[in-house]
Swiss-Prot record:
One Gene Ontology CC term in the entry: cytoplasm
The entry's keywords: Cell cycle, Cell division, Chaperone, Cytoplasm, Isomerase, Rotamase
Protein name: Trigger factor
Similarity-based family: Belongs to the FKBP-type PPIase family. Tig subfamily.
Function: Involved in protein export. Acts as a chaperone by maintaining the newly synthesized protein in an open conformation. Functions as a peptidyl-prolyl cis-trans isomerase.
Catalytic activity, as annotated: [protein]-peptidylproline (omega=180) = [protein]-peptidylproline (omega=0)
Enzyme Commission code(s) on record: 5.2.1.8
InterPro entries the record matches: PPIase_dom_sf, PPIase_FKBP_dom, Trig_fac, Trigger_fac_C, Trigger_fac_C_sf, Trigger_fac_ribosome-bd_bac, Trigger_fac_ribosome-bd_sf, Trigger_fact/SurA_dom_sf
Domain PPIase FKBP-type as annotated: residue spans: 166-251
Gene3D superfamilies with a match to the protein in the record: 3.10.50.40, Trigger factor ribosome-binding domain, Trigger factor, C-terminal domain
Molecular function GO labels: peptidyl-prolyl cis-trans isomerase activity
A Pfam family per the record: Trigger_C
Main location: cytoplasm
């Protein structure tokens, strides 16, 4: 077996691998000997079938396996000897693949881009500022007020009062399309909060200003993308009778409200809110700190990037942003989305930082534990209530999904490792300052 280098330019590598006919035949023979003890054939006892007969019957089938084993072995030996780590799966092409005949040498061309040498960084030269926000009384009171509004009740307005935006109207209604009532279009004593957006666009607005005992014909058009296809885009009329008009009344800030949210009393609820707010502030502060760290790391290192990785990342960015700008397009049945220079620049940054963090983690032997993976899978599974078991099985069968869950955990552990050696000072700020810092992340 012979491996000949045909290209070595920057990170680009190309080789010709030659497996001689004799080596290939020896591989086939090896597989036949390995299989012989388990093969039965008419006229022979199990394991006693002559190799010549086995080769005649099973040789063509084993030839492909032997060829693949030989090529894989040559590639593996080459990578171990050279120390190269391909950035992506090597491209392998069999020369004369369509015209190759048994008894001749197998010649394969292999191409790949090697991962670059990643320079060491001195974490002690990294200097960062961590924003610290305390949960003050005003923030706690604001959160309490929001909880009270979420737990609000509705009380009847004075007789003859007109419904306002935010009020609850209790209505009977019958919906029709082309003069015919349609299934699911009627209800009695239905409580509808005006302005909630829970009904078809334009419906709730036509009930603002109504009073008890008013009879109103609401005219609307079903959205073109409405779930019930037989109604999508159709004009409809709803005959409505207003039976009650109620004003919202926020719940009292007392122990009863606290018990609704699982706390023993109001003081305990305030304590829970304080802890939750500080956890939120801490998470937001970490996001700002991590971005600042990545910005510094990006300025500290410079090395050649595998062009194929950058190209793949740029296309992924362009594709993702296109779908964010076209949320109505759920599939991938669209033309090629060409990355812009901005996409390519962002891709280069992501690839550079990704390779740097991966190398730091590799050298420090950072790993993601089974317990950490289980927690990540559990967190994702909660998004599919009632289908948790199916999601677990889906993850178990998909290494790519496992890697998608593992990658951010690994990255955060490497970030923590770097922060341990960096100089990090704390700066106490208000929540508005933290919010501005978070908003600035989205603009970058």
């Amino acid at each position: 077996m012979q491996v000949t280098e045909t290209q070595k330019e920057g990170l680009k590598r190309a080789y010709t691998i030659t497996v001689t006919a004799a080596e290939l035949d020896a591989k086939v023979q090896e597989k036949l000997v390995e299989a012989q003890p388990d093969i039965e054939m008419k006229g022979f006892r199990k394991g006693k079938v002559p190799l010549a007969m086995l080769k005649k019957q099973f040789g063509p089938r084993l030839l492909g396996d032997a060829m693949q084993d030989a090529i894989d072995g040559a590639m593996r030996d080459h990578l171990e000897t050279s120390g190269d780590r391909p950035a992506m799966q090597p491209e392998v092409r069999m020369v004369d693949g369509e015209t190759w005949k048994e008894g001749t040498d197998v010649v394969v061309e292999m191409k790949y881009e090697a991962l670059p040498e990643i320079p060491e960084i001195e974490t002690s030269k990294v200097s960062l500022e961590r924003l610290v926000v305390k949960a003050d009384e005003a923030a706690i009171e604001e959160a309490l007020k929001n909880l009270a509004e979420s737990a609000q009740n509705f009380e009847d307005r004075r007789k003859g009062s007109k419904a306002k935006d935010g009020d609850q109207v209790v209505i009977d209604f019958k919906g029709s399309v082309d003069g015919e009532l349609f299934e699911g279009g009627s209800a009695e004593d239905y409580p509808l909060v005006l302005g909630s957006g829970s009904f078809i666009p334009g419906f709730e607005e036509q009930l603002v200003g109504t009073k008890v005992d008013d009879e109103v014909t609401v005219k609307v058009s079903f959205p073109a993308e409405y779930g019930a296809k037989h109604l999508a885009g159709k004009e409809a009329e709803f005959a409505c009778t207003v039976k009650a008009v109620k004003a919202p009344k926020a719940a009292e800030l007392d122990d009863e409200l606290a018990k609704k949210y699982g706390a023993e009393d109001l003081a305990a609820l305030k304590s829970q809110i304080s802890e939750r707010l500080e956890a939120e502030y801490k998470g937001a502060s970490r996001a700002v700190l991590k971005r600042a760290l990545l910005d510094q790391l990006d300025q500290m290192v410079s090395f050649e990037l595998p062009s194929k990785l950058v190209e793949a990342e740029a296309h992924q960015i362009a594709h993702q942003l296109w779908h964010e700008e076209h949320p109505e397009e759920h599939g991938h049945n669209h033309g090629n989305i060409e990355p812009t220079d901005e996409h390519k620049a962002l891709a280069e940054r992501r690839v550079r930082l990704g390779l740097l963090l991966a190398e730091i983690g590799r050298k420090a032997e950072v790993t993601v534990t089974d317990a950490e993976m289980t927690q990540a899978v559990l967190a994702q599974a909660r998004q599919y209530p009632g289908q948790e078991r199916a999601y677990f099985e889906f993850v178990q069968k998909n290494p790519q999904i496992q890697q998608q869950l593992r990658a951010p955990i690994f990255e955060d552990k490497v970030v923590d490792l770097i922060l341990e050696g960096a100089t990090v000072t704390e700066k106490e700020v208000g929540k508005d300052d933290l919010q501005k810092a978070i908003e600035a992340l989205d603009e970058m």
